[in-house]
Amino acid sequence: MLGYLSDGLRFLSFEGSWSLKPHEALTLNAALAWLPGDLENTARKQIAQRFFVERMSGGRVPCFRYYRMDPGLKIEGPLGSGDHFINVVLKIGRRRLNAKCVLHDGVVFGLEFPKPGSFFKNADIEVGSVSCDETAFSYTAVLDRAEHGIDSGD
């Protein structure tokens, strides 16, 4: 109950919603379509669960907060543990921007964009390419290090 109240306050302060914005949906669908068939089906079942999109950093980092994730919907295999990033190149006119879909411990965790959400409003966006990006830089990794410190295993 408190989760819904908290999400309602975020909604009223324009920091989140219960639905994806068009550029978020385009990026997420492109990333999930890149996954092999069985993993794509599992990931799509995850995002069919009820969730709230919490947007941080001006909409650059939308994170999915699931209310009740079915434990049987975790992605298995190499993408089932740790952080993985599916890189989606978005074409907006002549510009190319790299967005990411973040998988964390087998769950579709959120998205990352290099520009604030307002940049994408009313923009004509196409998907250029999709690949799995295992680079160390991501907004999610920066936030994780800020909260938990640097992992001594790296």
Please place each PLM-identified region on the residue numbering.
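Amphipathic protein-protein interaction modules
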Residues: 66-119
